Amino acid sequence: MKVLNLGSKKQASFYVACELYKEMAFNQHCKLGLATGGTMTDLYEQLVKLLNKNQLNVDNVSTFNLDEYVGLTASHPQSYHYYMDDMLFKQYPYFNRKNIHIPNGDAYDMNAEASTYNDVLEQQGQRDIQILGIGENGHIGFNEPGTPFDSVTHIVDLTESTIKANSRYFENEDDVPKQAISMGLANILQAKRIILLAFGEKKRAAITHLLNQEISVDVPATLLHKHPNVEIYLDDEACPKNVAKIHVDEMD
């Protein structure tokens, strides 16, 4: 597991955007696992700049999002469908829509939708890169504490802490969905390479637990210790004291 403090959200996001760009440039049929939320905004902004500058052919790139709120239509401003369109797919409108995969949070039968999305993941095979954030309680995707390590795509009852943390995106806390559909922990670990981003002081405790705690369902992110190719990029605020700071221009 590689852990680096790149100083700022902007610097870390730029570095990871370059990693995604290189993957798409050198592997035109690559499969990318994508994440959403406030952590990822600079990442997509930087990636869009790189794509637009170089007019990269992404017609054969496939994307797979981690999760979606249950009960929100794709057109809802707080849905992750809307987020991805707003942050990436409309900003660089050359991705093939048939290769964009995001769980449907407004399906009639959500358990059937979870099964269908899991089938898609299994049929498409390993993602080349999986992008992750981390919740303040150590969740990855929407896999809350207590989620079995062998879980696949499923419906999640969100914890009070997650609902409260996400309430800043809604008019009031009562508007935050109480459930989500999420890739399971087993799905996440199927990726060839995992890149986790964490920014801000509120994420420091979760990162400290991830790095120092034994693998436990109480902190789902600790399962990443079982994966052979994990990279964690932090800013100063999220970084535990024992992780040295490095500048992007010092990296290979």
From Swiss-Prot:
The active site is at 67 (proton acceptor), 137 (for ring-opening step), 139 (proton acceptor), 144 (for ring-opening step). It is an enzyme of class 3 (hydrolase). It holds the Pfam family Glucosamine_iso. Transmembrane segments: none annotated. Its EC number is 3.5.99.6. One of its GO terms (molecular function) is glucosamine-6-phosphate deaminase activity. Keywords: Carbohydrate metabolism, Hydrolase. One of its GO terms (biological process) is N-acetylglucosamine catabolic process. InterPro entries: Glc/Gal-6P_isomerase (IPR006148), Glucosamine6P_isomerase (IPR004547), Glucosamine6P_isomerase_CS (IPR018321), NagB/RpiA_transferase-like (IPR037171). GO terms for cellular component: cytoplasm. Gene3D superfamilies: 3.40.50.1360. It catalyses: alpha-D-glucosamine 6-phosphate + H2O = beta-D-fructose 6-phosphate + NH4(+). CDD domains: GlcN6P_deaminase. Pathway: Amino-sugar metabolism; N-acetylneuraminate degradation; D-fructose 6-phosphate from N-acetylneuraminate: step 5/5. HAMAP family: GlcN6P_deamin. Catalyzes the reversible isomerization-deamination of glucosamine 6-phosphate (GlcN6P) to form fructose 6-phosphate (Fru6P) and ammonium ion. Belongs to the glucosamine/galactosamine-6-phosphate isomerase family. NagB subfamily. This is Glucosamine-6-phosphate deaminase. It comes from Staphylococcus aureus (strain MRSA252).
